């Protein structure tokens, strides 16, 4: 059986093409053939036997980079399980030629047991919303069967476009209240999803409209839009060093974990690396030291939130905002809030930008806190937090209340479309468990030995980013002041935050553990280099960081199952001022040595372009693949 994995035509980075081959190789458990141009395959058997419609489908909307897909010749395997997980592919085709009596057995083996014998009389079969089967009969009784699969990830990315369609964009004329307004929007979303699924099956001869006035879903999904598609809740909040969702999802596949397994991110941040795990039937645990990161991750990973309760809470909130604005006396609380923010920011530019909006922000926050459901309250507060970040980064004349309402509506509609599509595809958004734990990855006493099926993470890159500064005002408004005890997350590398007691006893006491930690030669060489360059403070930060990372490696080794994998995304190189000159130092090998020093085997290193919005001092990343 041939399997052709056709990459998305709108890949955002050429490196994604090569990462896509890594992913499909892992999913198929074989080495695929790199296909530069798909049309050249039409000269080969069995592609030269395909009908025109199938050839048109395969060669339509191909990537214009260095390659267009990957080909494998393998025994029949369950392809449906693969299309539920694959990241970088617009379509995946399976093609096989066999005797008539074998067709049903092969279809069953690739994950399509629902096809009936009488259906094989048809030239085209649509067994489900994401599959098409094309059958061609030969005179000798054999049949050429082509199965076209639409990967779930592609459909979930495209479903975010339905909220741009006229039925969902324009406020209906008969909307007299928020209840009716949201009902009409939901009807528009559902109509758009039906249009999307129908178009993906039958709209392949339609040319997209590129200009203004787009009215058809094909105008949005059939061309490489410059707009970044934002599936699920990946982009609901700005957070330093946030990983690219496509890379994150593919990393889960490189771990070779199966449904029901559990993955761990020991430096989970805002949850980007594990947010897709529930969509793939995988359980996930994240460890995060900052309350703001944990709170964002809790929301981001909760795609199965009760939409009925959420809509009721949003309508109640909007009605409250519309009828009660500024009727409350907030002068005393507003004064206290301003003083607190002024104290921690020193009246910097961010404070000056946000100060005119603080009264309205405080009003919205108090209105949100009336919500009874804690999950919904957290969701609403995080969206408010994002507006705080936006308004503290740039001077904005617009009303923050209207901006918040618009953003909340947008995120609700994304959730609504995601849940509706999940129902159609049979994806249980609450079928897997995700737990975000406030804690320290150097002391994961909440996890037993040999219980984790795979680890993936992107730890802090030495001293490249401050994960607190851009969220400082938001942290203060949300009342997460504990996050500011370190001033900078670099302070967390210090020995006094390492502990040997239970994980939930923060802040931690001073331990002498650091003094007994042996670092590899590559780590010591870097520390000595910084010390000789009169960078005493910098050398100490780096030394603390490396010791912390070694302790984390030890804990990860302890909890990971035998022969399982740990994928770490880390900066390939780093720049420091040494003896008055900027020096670029290869830092990825230093982390690799640390992993090996606790027992891990380094089985692969994957280089790729930066997958983060906040580059800091980093240009290229390495993915270190360790195995226990």
For the regions a language model picked out, list residue spans one by one.
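A short glycine-rich, Lys/Arg-flanked "PGG" loop and its adjoining helix->strand segment in the class I
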Residues: 546-562
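Short glycine-dipeptide loop
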Residues: 480-484, 560-566
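Conserved class I S-adenosyl-L-methionine
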Residues: 260-267
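Glycine-rich SAM-binding Motif I of class I
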Residues: 271-275
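Surface-exposed cleft-lining segments at the edges of enzyme active sites
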Residues: 531-546
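Nucleic-acid modification enzymes, centered on SAM-dependent nucleic-acid methyltransferases
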Residues: 6-257, 287-521, 571-594, 605, ...
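Core SAM-dependent methyltransferase catalytic element
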Residues: 561-564, 615-628
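Short beta-strand element of Class I
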Residues: 283-285
């Amino acid at each position: 059986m041939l399997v052709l994995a056709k990459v998305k035509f709108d890949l955002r980075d050429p490196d994604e093409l090569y990462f896509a081959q890594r992913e499909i190789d892992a999913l198929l458990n074989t080495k695929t053939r790199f296909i530069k141009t798909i049309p050249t395959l039409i000269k080969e058997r069995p592609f030269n036997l395909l009908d025109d419609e199938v050839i048109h489908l395969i060669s339509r909307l191909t990537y214009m980079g260095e390659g267009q897909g990957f080909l494998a010749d393998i025994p029949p395997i369950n392809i449906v399980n693969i299309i539920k997980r694959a990241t970088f592919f617009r379509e995946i085709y399976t093609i096989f030629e066999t005797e008539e009596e074998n067709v049903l057995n092969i279809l069953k083996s690739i994950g399509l047991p629902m096809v009936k014998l009488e259906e094989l009389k048809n030239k085209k079969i649509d067994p489900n919303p994401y599959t098409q089967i094309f059958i061609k009969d030969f005179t000798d009784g054999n049949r050429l069967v082509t199965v076209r699969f639409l990967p779930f990830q592609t459909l979930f990315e495209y479903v975010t476009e339905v909220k741009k369609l006229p039925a969902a964009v324009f406020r209906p004329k008969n909307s007299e209240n928020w209840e009716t307004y949201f009902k009409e929007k939901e009807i528009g979303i559902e109509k758009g999803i039906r249009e999307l699924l129908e178009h993906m099956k039958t709209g392949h001869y339609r040319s997209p409209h590129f200009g203004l006035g787009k009215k058809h879903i094909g105008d949005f999904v059939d061309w490489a839009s410059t707009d970044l598609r934002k599936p699920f809740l990946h982009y609901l909040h700005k957070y330093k060093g946030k990983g690219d969702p496509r890379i994150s999802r593919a990393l889960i596949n490189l771990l070779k974990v199966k449904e029901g397994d559990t993955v761990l991110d020991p430096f989970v941040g805002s949850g980007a690396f594990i947010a897709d795990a529930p969509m793939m039937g995988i359980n996930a645990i994240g460890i995060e030291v900052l309350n703001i990161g944990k709170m964002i991750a809790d929301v981001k990973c909760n795609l199965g939130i009760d939409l009925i309760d959420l809509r009721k809470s949003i309508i109640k909130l909007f009605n409250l905002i519309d009828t009660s604005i500024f009727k409350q006396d907030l002068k005393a609380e507003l004064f206290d809030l301003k003083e607190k923010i002024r104290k921690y920011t020193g009246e910097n530019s961010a404070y000056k930008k946000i100060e005119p909006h603080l009264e309205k922000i405080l009003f919205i926050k108090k209105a949100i806190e009336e919500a009874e459901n804690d999950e919904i309250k957290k969701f609403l507060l995080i969206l408010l937090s994002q507006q705080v970040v936006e308004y503290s980064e740039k001077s904005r004349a617009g009303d923050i209340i209207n901006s918040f309402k618009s953003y909340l509506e947008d995120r609700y509609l994304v959730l609504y479309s995601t849940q509706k599509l999940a129902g159609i595809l049979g994806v249980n958004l609450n079928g897997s468990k995700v737990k975000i734990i406030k804690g320290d990855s150097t002391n994961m006493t909440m996890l037993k030995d040999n219980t984790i099926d795979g680890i993936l993470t992107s730890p802090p890159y030495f001293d490249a980013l401050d994960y607190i500064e851009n969220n400082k005002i938001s942290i203060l408004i949300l009342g997460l002041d504990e996050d500011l005890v370190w001033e900078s997350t670099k302070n967390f590398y210090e020995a006094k935050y390492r502990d040997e007691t239970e994980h939930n006893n923060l802040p931690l006491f001073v331990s002498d553990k650091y003094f007994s930690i042996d670092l590899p030669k590559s780590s010591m060489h870097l520390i000595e280099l910084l010390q000789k360059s009169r960078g005493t403070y910098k050398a100490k930060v780096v030394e603390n960081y490396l010791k912390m990372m070694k302790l984390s490696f030890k804990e990860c080794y302890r909890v990971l199952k035998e022969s399982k994998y740990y994928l770490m995304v880390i900066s390939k190189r780093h720049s420091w001022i040494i003896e008055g000159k900027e020096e670029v130092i290869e830092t990825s090998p230093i982390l690799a040595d640390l992993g090996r020093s606790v027992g891990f085997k380094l089985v692969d290193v994957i280089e790729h372009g930066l997958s983060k919005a906040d580059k800091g001092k980093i240009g290229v990343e390495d993915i270190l693949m360790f195995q226990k």
